[in-house]
Amino acid sequence: MIPVTTLKDRKVALFGLGGSGFATARALIAGGAEVTAWDDNPDSVAKASAEGIRTEDLHGIDWSQQALFVLSPGVPLTHPKPHWTVDLARAAGVDIVGDVELFVRERRAHAPDCPFIAITGTNGKSTTTALIAHILKSAGYDTQLGGNIGTAVLTLDPPKAGRYYVVECSSYQIDLAPTLNPSAGILLNLTPDHLDRHGTMQHYADVKERLVAGSDVAIVGIDDSHSALIADRVERAGVKVVRISRRNAVASGIYAEGIRLVQAVGGAMLPFADLDGIQTLRGSHNAQNAAAAVAACLAVGVSADAIRAGLASFPGLKHRMQPVGKRGRVVFVNDSKATNADAAAPALSSYDRIYWIAGGLPKAGGITTLAPYFPRIAKAYLIGEAAAEFAATLGEAVPYEISGTLERAVAHAAADAERDEAAASAVMLSPACASFDQYRNFEVRGDAFVSHVAALDGMTMLIGPATGEK
């Protein structure tokens, strides 16, 4: 835990007692703050009270006495309308921050020189974050991994000299971190997302820009127009910018040339790493993630050889284009995290012959945007509520069956793929749908896929059964 000592003996109001909010309350108390916490969920309040956290409806506190208001990132700050606690804090002139801001202040107070890499972007954040942490750990560095990737940042070990922090930041967390100042800040890309919480694309982009604008080194993907403009603007403001691209050469930075990463420096184009054969980094989207990781690790002093070794040994992330098993020429891929068509596209673009398991609770737009990848699909196996809709979209372009259940889809796809005479093929769960019609969440769906694959005869598992761990 990181005790928040910068608020010792100060009164702090806190709203939101979910996972990160609960951890934040404990970190504040450990640092000596006088915390008053609340949540709209009575069960969360009861749990906090049972753990010794002082709880009180924030309608009734004296806001003029509060040094700070700490808001959980899942609570609306501006859109669709500010949460009632936000209105109360603003009316009293109390600053509003989140857990990442508290971490930033503790680092600044106790170990301002310890390397801190922050990662954001619409897509690829978690893979890039995990890859950077893996490279650092593999190279022998004391590495702390947290943030939006699933480990609350204040549950990490406290800042000290020589300790490296790798923190994934959502737009909500950045919005609540006004003094965010990483050693290296990464903005991977920007496409419309979370506009219900940010109002406009411009506001969403402005929030993301703050992370790189406050960085010592800004690493920016320039393959979309919003991010390219941000790179130019931040550079004009005097920040060192390293540009990355998966599509085009850059004058200075890291870019992908097919499956190779190239470092552009001082007018020279130097081959840096070959991603061929690294199953967990297949696809052009992962080339961009790898380019960002390379740039960040170079920025904090990791040697080129250590970075290459880390790339080659990266185990990947659960449920994200994750090779889980192999039988003969057929690889089985868990991409359960692909909960919409855009998220499924990278996996479909990364294999040439696919037995595709898709469906679940459909999202608006269905799978029409995936038509360019239909020639790669040998057959589709449709499950869940989306089956009929997806069947209509596939029409005569792709052979399909309505399997109904994931277990049946895995069995049928595996049998068909085994009969395929192609040199290599993939049985892939990349549902392009939410899971809630059949599973509690995408993780449970992915674990079910792993279990069904593990039950097949003659299977060589690449991970532990139903755990997704190497």
From Swiss-Prot:
GO terms for molecular function: ATP binding; tetrahydrofolylpolyglutamate synthase activity; UDP-N-acetylmuramoylalanine-D-glutamate ligase activity. GO terms for cellular component: cytoplasm. ATP binds at G121, T122, N123, G124, K125, S126, T127. Pathway: Cell wall biogenesis; peptidoglycan biosynthesis. It holds the Pfam family Mur_ligase_M. Its EC number is 6.3.2.9. Keywords: ATP-binding, Cell cycle, Cell division, Cell shape, Cell wall biogenesis/degradation, Cytoplasm, Ligase, Nucleotide-binding, Peptidoglycan synthesis. InterPro entries: Folylpolyglutamate_synth_CS, Mur-like_cat_sf, Mur_ligase_C_dom_sf, Mur_ligase_cen, MurD. It comes from the Bacteria. The keyword ATP-binding applies. It is an enzyme of class 6 (ligase). GO terms for biological process: cell division; cell wall organization; peptidoglycan biosynthetic process; regulation of cell shape. It is found in: Cytoplasm. It catalyses: UDP-N-acetyl-alpha-D-muramoyl-L-alanine + D-glutamate + ATP = UDP-N-acetyl-alpha-D-muramoyl-L-alanyl-D-glutamate + ADP + phosphate + H(+). NCBIfam families: murD. Cell wall formation. Catalyzes the addition of glutamate to the nucleotide precursor UDP-N-acetylmuramoyl-L-alanine (UMA). Belongs to the MurCDEF family. This is UDP-N-acetylmuramoylalanine--D-glutamate ligase. It comes from Rhizobium etli (strain ATCC 51251 / DSM 11541 / JCM 21823 / NBRC 15573 / CFN 42).
